[in-house]
């Protein structure tokens, strides 16, 4: 026993600090989420700047890149169509089977005048009541890592994500797509073409003071998360036209910022940044329940 106790003692570390427990601050989602309507405006203003401020060669390069990107997108959607249709078919079959399991048929005790003529050889002469217990509605909230470490696999990841959004659209399943990034969105800084210049960095520091993302309830225990942004690239709240345009923008952007490459110019704020994964998880604690409430969903 003494030898065991000594061995345990030798395993102790004098450098270990005390365990500290922390709490989470309240999130100001209005300063974190960039809604799909705002993202659309970012792309629109970028296109306006390209048309008015870029050289003819740059404009031609951009136009060609957009055409090639859109063609590639259509080729991908055509290729994925059979997969999406199969997913929808399986989903609907499962729904039908689930509805059948939830169906309960009972006799009412009220005579069925149509079946009464069969009373001599059948006792089944009463009206039946068919009832269905409520099923469960589904919804999907997707969070995409929009960081530099994703550059090698971003295109493949986006392809998988779009298969899910296409499925949701065909199966009428509500969905939201958020990309989490350390790159912040400041409307007044869209004019900058170089986000690494000193003027841009100074402007960001000045704006950081006003764009609070967290409300600290307990200064002694609340952690201090990094500031980040959630870009709502795609949503079931979009109209068919809005979704089509957003899909083209999203596809072109993912190709341009990844190692896959692309000739589509994109806004600075939508470039790949760091990985605020923990912050995105904390934000999901508020986003998912609100998504459930707004859409009347049980399963997310």
Model-derived regions, located:
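Acidic, glycine-rich A-domain
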Residues: 3-300
